[in-house]
Amino acid sequence: MSAIESVMQEHRVFNPPEGFASQAAIPSMEAYQALCDEAERDYEGFWARHARELLHWTKPFTKVLDQSNAPFYKWFEDGELNASYNCLDRNLQNGNADKVAIVFEADDGSVTRVTYRELHGKVCRFANGLKALGIRKGDRVVIYMPMSVEGVVAMQACARLGATHSVVFGGFSAKSLQERLVDVGAVALITADEQMRGGKALPLKAIADDALALGGCEAVRNVIVYRRTGGKVAWTEGRDRWMEDVSAGQPDTCEAEPVSAEHPLFVLYTSGSTGKPKGVQHSTGGYLLWALMTMKWTFDIKPDDLFWCTADIGWVTGHTYIAYGPLAAGATQVVFEGVPTYPNAGRFWDMIARHKVSIFYTAPTAIRSLIKAAEADEKIHPKQYDLSSLRLLGTVGEPINPEAWMWYYKNIGNERCPIVDTFWQTETGGHMITPLPGATPLVPGSCTLPLPGIMAAIVDETGHDVPNGNGGILVVKRPWPAMIRTIWGDPERFRKSYFPEELGGKLYLAGDGSIRDKDTGYFTIMGRIDDVLNVSGHRMGTMEIESALVSNPLVAEAAVVGRPDDMTGEAICAFVVLKRSRPTGEEAVKIATELRNWVGKEIGPIAKPKDIRFGDNLPKTRSGKIMRRLLRSLAKGEEITQDTSTLENPAILEQLKQAQ
């Protein structure tokens, strides 16, 4: 395999602020290395120590790791615990009962505060109500809800009973919801009348009804509806129930059902490259352990922090760093219903200032769109807001290009907040490669080093290690407690997708291209393996070309894909959003030429995009991820046949199609 070539030359280094390091959970690179050494010396002992110290077990485990049926690994299997008990009851016992657990801000700006005692009561009453409806340990419950306290309550109530939840993002279509209901074998669906996004009401209950009408969901005996807006909804007597009625009159306590550490806490569906979505199955013990460890290590969570992860509970980030991790850590967190651009694009900065957020965790896509908004309107520039409460920033969901990193560092963190650029996946359960804010010298665009206990490596297509400085395929060499256990109902697909025989069947395949710096050993993620371009025999990660484009002062956002080319094998096609209005005609030709030359100067002639198309924005999911598969189809001139139900802005496809 020809090495994936990294053309990013990033030499800026930012050390942890002294005051931060001295108070941090991991205060130095020496402390980081000591933990890595402990894991190398005694891998099972390392994980067992943390599991015993950090979690409450109703039955202590005696066996740490079972590898007898690899790659179907089992951790702490003979131990028993309950995730909801660890998140809620322990906080009632350790003095946090009257501490605020959730500061909920609705789309319209109204704020509700819920203490740990109140949250525990809500969860227990709802869990008792579910039990009264016949929902038991091992049942699967699908949750299709807006961002809300009630969404977290629904997840925690399922965990309390030992019912496996499967949260479906509120932006998914009826067909997508139906597929997940059928695949997971749900016995109940928890939804809402409507959800609010950017001042608009979206009809969740109507979509849920349509999903159930598509058939195959006969096992769903109960549809429980959270009354979010009071909007009118269709009603099926005997099946549909209001959430408040399910909880009404139920006791404030509900015994937490002990489950095996390997009991499925949840199944979360993620897109497959082909075929139906993959139901990623996570365990209870190993998953919860890593959620809590990464809250302590990556976010350095302290008792007086106000933590805000802007994700949706429909994605894994919202599971680990809203519904479970912060509660297990006894933290106070913001939960937000709305969008970053309503009522204007200063919403995030306004909320940080009003609530005095200290740790802020968001996606690079959101940062890039807010850069564009801030530069277009001085009134909503971050400098207009008091962001002095912040002490730590984070990014999640995709690699962050160095220019966006620097803007975030300067304008949001005021050059005093470390940035944890976290690489992880739905399948990994929690962070894998990330800076530690009190220890790691930061390099813009690099997720730096694996967390202690995570044996990440870069290999070629035969599974052999490649030297630092050469690109390759990111893998993890040893199992870890929070890893995916299987694909729900499809163990063979799990084995082929994540432990392919081509790599020897024992390496976890992350599916991303990566490179390690020759000197520091730092990892840079170069995009999905299928986002690697091969132009005239040169293999390049799309992220690097995107970073070069975005570093041009005219460019707000860029996405790069490949298309077949008779001469070069593959040609580079760039979709670009400018900081000003979209150019057309002669002006578009002129700016495209400028940008080609810019990339040639930044990277080299081989990286010049053959095609550049300008749009008002890029096709994105409602969670803000760029839908690159649609861009690939556009670049190739193909008709769009893929599912576009999660697309936030469908009209952009026609605009980009016409832009060629």
Swiss-Prot record:
InterPro entries: Ac_CoA_lig, ACAS_N, AMP-bd_C, AMP-bd_C_sf, AMP-binding_CS, AMP-dep_synth/lig_dom, ANL_N_sf. Signal peptide: none annotated. PROSITE patterns: AMP_BINDING (PS00455). Keywords: Acetylation, ATP-binding, Ligase, Magnesium, Metal-binding, Nucleotide-binding. Pathway: Ketone degradation; acetoin degradation. The modification N6-acetyllysine is found at K625. Mg(2+) binds at V550, V555. The keyword Chloroplast does not apply. This is Acetyl-coenzyme A synthetase. The lineage of its organism: Bacteria, Pseudomonadati, Pseudomonadota, Betaproteobacteria, Burkholderiales.
